[in-house]
Amino acid sequence: MNIAAKPPLTIRLCGPRGFCAGVDRAIQIVVLALKSYGAPVYVRHEIVHNRYVVEGLEAKGAVFVEELDEIPAEHRAQPVVFSAHGVPKSVPEDAASRNLFYLDATCPLVSKVHKQAMRHNRLGRHVVLIGHAGHPEVIGTMGQLPEGSVSLIETIEDADAYVPVDPDNLGYVTQTTLSVDDTAGVITRLHERFPNLTAPAADSICYATTNRQEVVKQAAPGCDLFIIVGAPNSSNSKRLVEVALRAGAKKSILVQRAAELDWDEIGAISTLGLSAGASAPEVIVNEIIEAFRARFDARVELAETVQETENFLVNRELRNIELTAADMAFVNG
């Protein structure tokens, strides 16, 4: 019996992809807290926007809540971790009022945006925050400042319609996970309308967001399909889907697990682009590759722009706890 040959497929695997230093740090904080203090360790909001990661931490003993009042009184001696997206100032204040011990896993680059916004405010500027309404990072940044001292701008249309009280006394910051190109367009329009608009001391969009978008731009032309591994509530992952389409991929989709792949819809392809959002673990990237290898004679080509070496330290309370490869195998493989 003749066995049909698998059709050839080139997979353009983007690098860098997947976890950034801030996500790595946040997950490590929860893992180390569990090793140090024992289960349960409470986490306010998803530590990062990825269900695979959340479920892996739940299996280790983490309990995810949306508000601090969900923590049972009998467990208030256990630590609570704040997510990588950052929280309003009111959250640690609430934790202190409840005598909760908390570990802040806010990404240091998000904390930098908080400081930039507070500096604008301290110098008397009204803060313009470029970001997506309702995103936890935006909620956290707006929550650093008094009510009414921040205006949220999402699009160029918002920038056109914006009417500030004092157009000569504005300073902007941005969410860290936005589209680099879209954000540049909004900033340009704001500068056109408000020439005295003050920029932050450093770019707010994080290195990892920029790097992942740049390599997707380079890899996308000529791809029949581009897959971004990530969750539907992951801002940076959704931006990568958009970047791939704009850069020339015929189709781009967001996938959480290989089981979601619709092979009838994928059809006959010869070139596949593959990357992962900053909160998507490498084990799922490998899972996707193996799913395609089962159906295609797949050859993987690495499309790499830069190598990332950034590393953020965990909280001081956890630095003497050993973190092993086995501790992180659930996400790293």
UniProtKB/Swiss-Prot annotation:
GO terms for biological process: dimethylallyl diphosphate biosynthetic process; isopentenyl diphosphate biosynthetic process, methylerythritol 4-phosphate pathway; terpenoid biosynthetic process. It comes from the Bacteria. Dimethylallyl diphosphate binds at H49, H85, H135, S234, S235, N236, S279. [4Fe-4S] cluster binds at C20, C107, C206. It catalyses: isopentenyl diphosphate + 2 oxidized [2Fe-2S]-[ferredoxin] + H2O = (2E)-4-hydroxy-3-methylbut-2-enyl diphosphate + 2 reduced [2Fe-2S]-[ferredoxin] + 2 H(+); dimethylallyl diphosphate + 2 oxidized [2Fe-2S]-[ferredoxin] + H2O = (2E)-4-hydroxy-3-methylbut-2-enyl diphosphate + 2 reduced [2Fe-2S]-[ferredoxin] + 2 H(+). Pathway: Isoprenoid biosynthesis; dimethylallyl diphosphate biosynthesis; dimethylallyl diphosphate from (2E)-4-hydroxy-3-methylbutenyl diphosphate: step 1/1; Isoprenoid biosynthesis; isopentenyl diphosphate biosynthesis via DXP pathway; isopentenyl diphosphate from 1-deoxy-D-xylulose 5-phosphate: step 6/6. The keyword Iron-sulfur applies. Keywords: 4Fe-4S, Iron, Iron-sulfur, Isoprene biosynthesis, Metal-binding, Oxidoreductase. Gene3D superfamilies: 3.40.50.11270, 4-hydroxy-3-methylbut-2-enyl diphosphate reductase, catalytic domain. CDD domains: lytB_ispH (cd13944). The active site is at E137 (proton donor). This is 4-hydroxy-3-methylbut-2-enyl diphosphate reductase. It comes from Rhizobium johnstonii (strain DSM 114642 / LMG 32736 / 3841). The lineage of its organism: Bacteria, Pseudomonadati, Pseudomonadota, Alphaproteobacteria, Hyphomicrobiales.
